[in-house]
Amino acid sequence: MAPQSTAIFGIVRTDCAQCQSPKGKSRGSLLRERKLVTFCLHALLLLMEPKRCSWAKDPLLIEYHDTEWGVPSHEDHRLFELIVLESMQSGLSWLTILRKRQAFRAAFFGFDPAKIAKFGSKQIDNLLANPGIIRNRAKVEAAVTNAQATLKVQQIFGSLDSFLWNLVDRKPVINHWTDSNQIPAKTSLSERLAKEFKAQGFKFIGPTVAYAFMQAIGMVNDHETGCDRHKELGGD
């Protein structure tokens, strides 16, 4: 336990000990004791709460941050899902996408590229009438095109995983940002990936979307250095 945490814990332990008063106390004394108990509980909760990146505030964002974001992903199925979701997120908040994620999964057959690649105008029109997803024709059509491109990449490179992770020699890039505001919207590496995507026929994946995708699949560790996940995912 860090020195600061030890000091706080000492205060909590002392104050909680004061709460154990004998019977017969006045109403004022009981109220003070209740306040001390409340203080103790709040202090303990603060000690137990994980340190997170500053953007993880909403419960959905916290869960995503703690369990998915920045975790190296190598399963083609998940990689394709994030290609679709990140391209859908363009111009919107990630929280909006997370809130619609289950609807996306249902509408896109669990993000099965083989099924999505066969979508025609009828299926696309059905998607555009679905209030649970992002009803943007260009983005929906891009999802179909990207499913077709994914199948092509799997034939050429053996897997979507190989195509993507060879860009960083299969090792995550560990960054050291102290604040999320320091993180760039794109990098030379994401510009290179965007060109690779375009060369293989992918659409709606520019350098900014490509970088968000790289963060999501753990190609780069962009957790803040003060966040517990930074070290847990290979940061020093």
Model-derived regions: residue spans:
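A general signal for intrinsically disordered, low-complexity N-terminal leader regions
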Residues: 20, 45-46
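HhH-family (HhH-GPD) DNA N-glycosylase catalytic core used in base-excision repair
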Residues: 5, 46-236
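Cysteine-centered motifs
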Residues: 16-19, 40
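Generic short amphipathic/hydrophobic targeting helices enriched at N-termini
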Residues: 4-8, 33, 44
